[in-house]
Structures are given as C-alpha cells and as structure tokens.
C-alpha cells in the first residue's frame, strides 16, 4: 500500500487570496473552489453575514441574513494561489477554510517526500506557512520512519498556546473554539495568539519534514 500523507497547512500570508482578506473583517463559512471548463480560470465561493462589507466579490445568493459570494480569477504566475500550487503537484485540495485573515488547506500527498516538496514550494511563495496536522498511512509492514521532536525547541509560551488550543478543540473539524476564544482563555489578544501558534507550528514543521 502506498504510504500516503494527509496534511493540513495554515497559511497566514494576507496576499494568498481574496477569501482570506474577507475573513479579517467577518466570519467566513463554507469555502469551496472549482476550476472552469477551459482549465484557465477558477471560482471560489464563500458564505458571510449579509451585513459584512465585502468588496471585489460578486453576491450570488442571499438567504436568512447570509450571502454567498463568488470570486473568479484567471491562472497567472502573478496571481497564483496556494490551491493552484498544491494542485500543480497532482494533489487536489480536500478542505479549504478561511479565518482571521489566514487560510487552512488539507490535501493528500503520495508520500512524505512529495508532501515536503509541496511545503517547500508553499514556503517559498507565501509567508506564514505552518503545519496544523500531519497523518501518515499505516504501512503494510511494521517498519516506519520515526521522527523525534525536541519540545525544548518551543518556548514555554508556545507550548502553552499549542496545548490550550488543542484542549479547547481549535484543531478539530468543525472547530470547537475559534482563535478569539482561545486567545481569551490565554489572556492575550488574537494577533498574539496567532503569532505564537504560527511560530510553534513552523518549528514543528521544520523538524518533522527536515526543511
């Protein structure tokens, strides 16, 4: 059996896409993406409160105080998004969400080496790339590749942020707590929480993937 790797990546770069920009100002739900029939355009749809002021997106549906918006763009090197980069490696994006100006994407790579290549390319194209979850298929044989993580690589504050986020269900699907709620539990503001979490995840990602 192929030792596939299921990864979930957090990208905090504000330039990544229009949906991430919208999520800075309001709650964004139900993000979906599709490629046009000609293969040179993509459309992204997301749901947000109708009261939100969202520019540069077409309103396509409205119901019960919520509006579905659509953003369409052509594929160019200048406007290439993280989804296109990942799919360029032959890995469809399985899950996409936006929160607090960042996006979370999940995909399955054929093996750890392929996953590492995608992450390296993401990190070269965008700032604030960090690992949220990494699951590897159980191999048919008992042999495996163990990775030892030195907890001392993380500061005490970074460990506290990770542990609190985990305990409160921040990494669950669907989330049991959002960034604002976890930050409140830690008695810090949301931007500080995001900064500590991103730094901790980046250190773990570098260790696990050896990049």
Swiss-Prot record:
Keywords: Activator, DNA-binding, Plasmid, Transcription, Transcription regulation. Disruption phenotype: Cells lacking this gene are not able to grow anaerobically by denitrification. Inactivated transcription of the denitrifying genes (nitrate reductase narA and nitrite reductase nirK). No effect on growth under aerobic conditions. No effect on dimethyl sulfoxide (DMSO) respiration. Disulfide bonds: none annotated. InterPro entries: DmsR-like_N, HTH_bacterioopsin, WH-like_DNA-bd_sf. Pfam families: DmsR_N (PF24277), HTH_10 (PF04967). One of its GO terms (molecular function) is DNA binding. This is Transcriptional regulator NarO. It comes from Haloferax volcanii (strain ATCC 29605 / DSM 3757 / JCM 8879 / NBRC 14742 / NCIMB 2012 / VKM B-1768 / DS2). The gene is narO.
